[in-house]
Amino acid sequence: MKNQFFNLKTISLALSALVLTVSCSEDNTNPTEEEKQEESRWITVAAAKMGDNPGDGNGGTLIYALSSDDAKDETKSIAPFDNGFIVPSNRTARLQASEDGNTIFNISYAGDTGGNYSKYTVNGGQNFTATGSEVSIAPYVGSAPRWIKLFDGDKTGAAVYVSTEHQFNDNGTPDDDTDDVYTRTEATMGIVTLDLENSLIKNFEESSVTLTAEEEAQGYYISRIDMPTLNAAGDKLYIGARLSKVDPATAERDNDYEILGAKTIVLDYPSLLNPTVISSSIGYGNTNGYRSINSFLYNGSVYQANQGDSNGSHILKIDSSNAYDNSYDFSLDTALGVTGAYVLAWRPAANGKAVLAYRHDGSQDGISGRPESYFALIDLEAKTATKLEGIPYEVDMEMFQYQSYAVNGSDIYLTAAPVGKNGNIYVVDTETGDVTKGAELVNVDGSHFIGAW
């Protein structure tokens, strides 16, 4: 029965594509029908298998595709752990999708194949066809790269890393380290851009990334970077950053320190040169995110989530001047009426309304050892946020490793399932806030779903 469903759906989408091709060469006599057909697309669901512990996702990644119509149909059921396509990756794969959903991009994470880039044509079900050639970015950014697909028409990917080295003044006695004095920590950023269409390395640069002299003297340094985002002009990249600190007196890690304003690295694109660091006075903590894209371009500005803020996560705004707009104050604690909101993954539709996964201080730890998560609908212009009540929550449902939402017009598709338990795809109409329960997601012990593409 499932195979029949898959074959018919594949044939249906293929015929739809043929009809669209023919309609482009003839007079448009039925625009309503054409627009309706263009709304259909593949939705790919990713499932992360347990390794040693529930929810660790270290047992590998499987993907399964269904049409957007079937994803919205709660009578459908898919079992990616049993019938999915195994994505090459030693641990949880880092996935991206083309804007139309027809291509999946993967860079293997860790292990012997870590850093290998590959892409697949989506054909439905477990049928993903490798296309193009593979290329490794490991020589540039290591075998466990943090990478993202830029929103430039599916042309470019970008991966980053940062390495650090504490620096000391030896007081003129290079052979005696007892009188050495800590001065600062050197942070070296590497970034590689990847031609996604032709599987080629486009550019690679390494640069020193500095904070203010005062911040560095106090022991602060950039320790992790992630999630490059292209600005509206296409001439700057914004890279999220996390700060760490050492005690200048001992050069030992300092875990009890003042959290500084959120920071972002800005560098020229496509040259990848001239990095500078900008700071927010609205949000504090980190901007590098974790597994999902943490900042998005909307209406000429880039909107970015922060994490680790003692006042809860904010949505921050970087305007066309490539600086934080500190007049834009969007506190999720205030909007949601919670304390300690922490953004796990979010994604806006083109209308500036977004679905956001979060936890807060009231979340209880589940079987994975991580706190329960929730979903909210937020509005970037109105600066409002409302918890989505059409989704069943329970303590074992957490989104710490969540990677992606699928956007289809004003609809946003998400996966929601507790660790080790069945769940469903849910579709959020961002215009109305309505939530539609979609296809069932069949789970297995200790495993979880990490998003839709």
Regions found by a protein language model. Give the residues of each.
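Bacterial Sec-dependent N-terminal signal peptides
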Residues: 1-46
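Short beta-strand elements that form the blades of beta-propeller/WD-repeat-like
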Residues: 39-54, 100-111, 155-175, 235-247, ...
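Post-signal peptide N-terminal segment of secreted/secretory-pathway proteins
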Residues: 55-182
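Beta-propeller blade signature
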Residues: 59-70, 117-124, 178-200, 251-272, ...
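Beta-propeller fold detector
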Residues: 72-85, 126-140, 193-218, 274-283, ...
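Repeated scaffold domains used in trafficking and secretory/extracellular systems
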Residues: 84-98, 137-153, 215-229, 284-297, ...
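Acidic, serine/threonine- and glycine-rich low-complexity intrinsically disordered segments
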Residues: 205-366
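Intrinsically disordered, low-complexity segments enriched in Gly and acidic/Ser/Thr residues
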Residues: 314, 322-421
